[in-house]
Structure formats: C-alpha cells, structure tokens
Curated annotation (Swiss-Prot):
UniProt xrefs under NCBIfam families: PRK05309.1, uS11_bact
One GO MF term attached to the UniProt entry: structural constituent of ribosome
Disulphide linkage map: none
Source organism of this protein record: Chlorobium chlorochromatii (strain CaD3)
Organism taxonomic ancestry: Bacteria, Pseudomonadati, Chlorobiota, Chlorobiia, Chlorobiales
Record-linked Gene3D superfamilies: Ribosomal protein S11
GO biological process, one term: translation
Complex and partners: Part of the 30S ribosomal subunit. Interacts with proteins S7 and S18. Binds to IF-3.
Protein family according to the UniProt entry: Belongs to the universal ribosomal protein uS11 family.
Coiled coil (UniProt feature): none
Keyword Ribosomal protein applies: yes
Name of the molecule in the record: Small ribosomal subunit protein uS11
Domain of life the protein comes from: Bacteria
General function of this protein: Located on the platform of the 30S subunit, it bridges several disparate RNA helices of the 16S rRNA. Forms part of the Shine-Dalgarno cleft in the 70S ribosome.
Pfam (any one): Ribosomal_S11
Length: 127
C-alpha cells in the first residue's frame, strides 16, 4: 500500500490571537489559535519529552508554553488573550513563559468548569 503524503494547511496568522492552556493534574496542553479559533501552534508536556509525574511540574509547563509561543511568534503573532482551564501546577509559569517568548498578554481569563454540586467525587486516597 502506497503512503499518501498530505500537504500541511497554511494558516494566515494575524497579530492578534488566543492561548488556551489546559492544566490537568497529569499533563499540560497549550494551544495557540487565531481570532476565528483556527489552531496556529500547539504543544504539550509529553511532546516536549517529559514523562510520568514530571509532566505536571511548573518547569514542564514553562517549556511547553515557550515552545508553542515561539512557533506562533515566528508566524507573526504578537498579542494574545489567555484562557486557562484546570487545576494544574504550572498555570502561572505558563503565562510568564508566554511573556518571556515575546507575546504580549492582553487579558487572562480562568475558564475552569466548576460544578454546581454535580457528580459525586471519587473516594479519598488512603496512602
């Protein structure tokens, strides 16, 4: 069976965009989109070589957001609005890394979903 090579879709990048940071207890994912929501660049802790419990550290979060921000900066993005979701460890480190990579952070919004007493949580760990 012959392999089919697919051409990567070129995204026209505007100087304004959005950064979506999902910081869970196990991993961190950073996606940078344009104003319409089309993905410009993305990165995760696993993509940057972190394994296991090291994925949920502030340093992994810093490296992850620097990698995504550098790619978006090279494509022409300069100003971003940040949306953070989740309770992970490296939320603040991710924002500082975005600013360090040259992106100007205009707004920061926490969009972590909070239940109005929805599902019963899992039982407490006894170690």
């Amino acid at each position: 069976m012959a392999t089919v090579s697919r051409k990567k879709k070129k995204v026209k990048v505007t100087p304004e965009g959005a950064v979506h940071i999902k910081a869970s207890f196990n991993n961190i994912m950073v996606t940078i989109t344009d104003v319409q929501g089309n993905t410009v660049s993305w990165s995760s802790a696993g993509k940057n070589g972190f394994k296991g419990s090291k994925k949920n550290t502030p340093y992994a979060s810093q490296v992850t957001s620097e990698a995504a921000a550098k790619e978006a900066f090279d494509l022409g993005m300069r100003h971003v609005h940040v949306f953070i979701k989740g309770p992970g460890a490296g939320r603040d480190a991710a924002i500082r890394a975005l600013q360090g990579a040259g992106l100007e952070v205009r707004t920061i919004k926490d969009i972590t979903p909070l239940p109005h007493n929805g599902c019963r949580p899992p039982k407490r760990r006894r170690v």
